[in-house]
UniProtKB/Swiss-Prot annotation:
Gene Ontology CC entries for this record: cytosolic large ribosomal subunit
Protein name as catalogued: Large ribosomal subunit protein uL1
Alphabetical list of HAMAP family matching this protein: Ribosomal_uL1_B
Organism for this UniProt entry: Shewanella baltica (strain OS185)
Cross-referenced Pfam families: Ribosomal_L1
Source lineage: Bacteria, Pseudomonadati, Pseudomonadota, Gammaproteobacteria, Alteromonadales
């Protein structure tokens, strides 16, 4: 049996895996146990009451967190004309059409989000094998294919998170950094859960949000008592 590190022993002593914690207590635990030499991200896993094998029960979308994610987001935009100028004015690092596609084909991938206006999808469509596996392919459901590219750029820069359930019906995303205040992390989590509830598929039956766990990059998951969250449906 592998020997537990000192860090893991401390986590096991502090975190009760059978308990759901008040959100404030859960955040305090994460902060206490975040001892890495860098500012860890705070990640969330939300178990949904869906059958992920059925396409009409899959959950996918995006929402802007009120306090952002703490990350500097680099944005690439496929568009032209007045939209190109608007995207640049909104803060996009890369804007273009065929010229931008050629850069990506050549391996230049120094961006975190790709946005496209509908008229640019003929160009973006040819990059599916490059962007798709990296989770960067623009999609109307996440607001990254839109005629209003400037607004999409602003949302991405403001801390928009995109979510999509995995094959087990779990949503994984980030809600900030461990140096955020407890209130900021709580409000970001509440915004995400509210967005997920609004995205509930009509055919999903029973309890929709089954379990919420938060963790830091190097830490263990801490289950959150949903009753301590203020969310809207």
């Amino acid at each position: 049996m592998a020997k537990l590190t000192k860090r893991m022993r401390v986590i096991r002593e502090k975190v009760d895996g059978t308990k759901s914690y008040d959100i404030n207590e859960a955040v305090a635990l994460l902060k206490e146990l975040a001892t890495a030499k860098f500012v860890e991200s705070v990640d969330v896993a939300v178990n949904l009451g869906i059958d992920p094998r059925k396409s009409d029960q899959n959950v996918r979308g995006a929402t802007v967190l009120p306090h952002g994610t703490g990350r500097d987001v680099r944005v690439a935009v496929f568009t032209q004309g007045a939209n190109a100028e608007a995207a640049k004015a909104a803060g996009a690092e890369l804007v273009g059409m065929d010229d931008l596609a050629e850069k990506i084909k050549a391996g230049e991938m120094n961006f975190d989000v790709v946005i496209a206006s509908p008229d640019a999808m003929r160009v973006v469509g040819m990059l599916g094998q490059i962007l798709g596996p990296r989770g960067l392919m623009p999609n109307p459901k996440t607001g990254t294919v839109t005629p209003n590219v400037a607004e999409a750029v602003k949302n991405a820069k403001a801390g928009q998170v995109r979510y999509r359930n995995d094959k087990n019906g779990i949503i994984h995303t980030t809600i900030g950094k461990v140096d955020f205040t407890p209130v900021q992390l709580k409000e970001n989590l509440e915004a995400l859960v509210s967005a997920l509830k609004k995205a509930k598929p009509a055919v999903a039956k029973g309890i929709f949000v089954k379990k919420i766990s938060i963790s830091t990059t190097m830490g263990a998951g801490v289950a959150v008592d949903q009753a301590t969250l203020e969310t809207t449906v």
